[in-house]
From Swiss-Prot:
Enzyme class: transferase
Amino acids binding substrate: R89
This protein's name: Acetate kinase
Reactions catalysed according to its record: acetate + ATP = acetyl phosphate + ADP
Annotated positions binding Mg(2+): N7, E382
PANTHER family: ACETATE KINASE, ACETATE KINASE-RELATED
The organism of origin for this protein: Campylobacter fetus subsp. fetus (strain 82-40)
PROSITE patterns: ACETATE_KINASE_1
Biological processes, Gene Ontology terms: acetate metabolic process; acetyl-CoA biosynthetic process
Amino acid sequence: MKILVINSGSSSIKFKLYDMSDESVICKGLIEQIGAKNSYAKIVTKTGEIAEKREEIPDHGTGIDVMNELLFNSHALTSLDEIDGVGHRVVQGADLFNDAVLVDDDVLQKIEELIPLAPLHNPAHLAGMKETLKVRPDIPNVAVFDTVFHQTMPKSSYMYPLPIEFYEKYKIRRYGAHGTSHQFVAKAGAKILGVDFDHFSCITLHLGNGASIAAIKNGKCIDTSMGLTPLEGLMMGTRCGSIDPAIVPFLMKNANLSGEEIDTIMNKKSGLLAIGGSNDMREIEARMDAGDENAKLAFEMFVLRIKKYIGAYISILGEINAIIFTAGIGENDARIREAVCSGLEIFGIRMDKDKNAAKKDEPRRVGLPETKVRIIIVPTDEELAIAEDTLRIINQSKK
């Protein structure tokens, strides 16, 4: 079976086509700058052949047409009939969805109702789904939500200590993000250690430009760092993470900033960028090595906040099998991994520096073998996880 995975952003479409008989990637591609006159489209086949084009792509509907054209011209497909299903990434499913679902009018309506909780993401996801269904309504489309894995959090974890009517009226609570990634790498970690996932407990660290951490007990998420939005939690590339909420009214009063301006600052002008001058950890480390004190401070703040969460999560999980690093920084930055694990020896976490420094693009253990808690690096593959969920939901619908 062939499954097409689509991730529609506000001005982009990323896609991957899988052969699910062996979970191999047939091709992958992206379309950028949708709405601009000089939009960019690219596809890469499994043999490494690349096709690119620049033309005006005014909207997502045209973007889907361009995607199909790329799929045909690259010979990844000869007909849309070859596609058995389409899986769509959806950032926010709130508490309306506790699993991936076949897309129908009711699902589209619910995703639209959740736009206030994800104003940058859900409209783009909707556009991708609607346009795909418009082209071939007979091909099953499945919505896979970033928030589903976090739906097992207990109420004590997801509620905020605010007036209860804010939750009842506006659904203000912790939803988390990166759930597809956290679940994927946790399952991979359990497989590496030969532990049944239902009896596997770990802490997963998705460290990229966006960063989050999750506490997983017996295969279920019981807490995560991101909240109502992806702004809460860890320090990130351009996001501040958790701060004193009183800073917002303070800035409104003393800096004469609007709520919208502060939201932009906290999402796009804070984090590593604000303190160290770059949202790229590689640049931060290069500046730090050159003697830049602000870059050093940014590095230390980033690590400290991760360690605080690890300590807190160990206290609520009790015994854990592993700490798992993933995403751009988590998978590739040995220096960050070593700094994060340094000082955690009291919890049975000890890094093997040689294994940690080795550069490999595969799941691997990097802790000392005699330690109680394993340290594992797992390259995340959210698209494959979406493809697997899509296939599962389609098969269930046939029973």
